[in-house]
Amino acid sequence: MKQFWSPSSINKNKAMVENLQNHGIVTSDEVAKAMEAVDRGVFVTDRSSAYVDSPMSIGYNVTISAPHMHAMCLQLLEKHLKPGMRVLDVGSGTGYLTACFAVMVGTEGRAIGVEHIPELVASSVKNIEASAASPFLKEGSLAVHVGDGRQGWAEFAPYDAIHVGAAAPEIPEALIDQLKPGGRLVIPVGNIFQDLQVVDKNSDGSVSIKDETSVRYVPLTSREAQLRGD
């Protein structure tokens, strides 16, 4: 997988975002502001490697994605993350991207994370509490729930944006059902070989699907299979 800078060259959150801008990955002010506000270092155990452009293990056979992948997904969803919009983050892990989403949609919007490992949900809430997204958690526009992300989170559907942080063999119907007409879903699809797919829902309920790039994610699976390392 492509790495955009060496491990030793970046050791600050702002410098990480500037590098993403210099490489043309972050192209909008809104995404840059959100990533600058939400310090990635708060969401990883090894802060010395927090800003390296590489995925990092977070336990339970899963990883936090590399910064350039988070930035790419934020850019792909940017027009669907305006203030007041609703966003669902499936496989929310450390809570980092959920926090970025919350900053972008603001207090009038809603950012929902779904993660099926209870321990990760608990630690992600602590991470968010220590971040710039803490006010959104306190007043209720940001929440993280224990659940099977393949089923989405119907309580606050439909969503303007849905992000999936693990690879599904095919796009779960529940996520398409919970996507608002005019909304966008970004999801890695495939088994060994995966594509990051952009799914746009049309006004008549049909969907248009585009392959954005080849990727490698951990599988979107059951909690039991994940803990076994299947």
Curated annotation (Swiss-Prot):
Keywords: Cytoplasm, Methyltransferase, S-adenosyl-L-methionine, Transferase
Molecular-function GO terms, alphabetical: protein-L-isoaspartate (D-aspartate) O-methyltransferase activity
Organism: Arabidopsis thaliana (Mouse-ear cress)
One of the GO BP terms on file: response to abscisic acid
PANTHER family: PROTEIN-L-ISOASPARTATE O-METHYLTRANSFERASE, PROTEIN-L-ISOASPARTATE O-METHYLTRANSFERASE 1
The name this protein goes by in its record: Protein-L-isoaspartate O-methyltransferase 1
Annotated CDD domains: AdoMet_MTases
Domain of life, per lineage: Eukaryota
EC numbers for this chain: 2.1.1.77
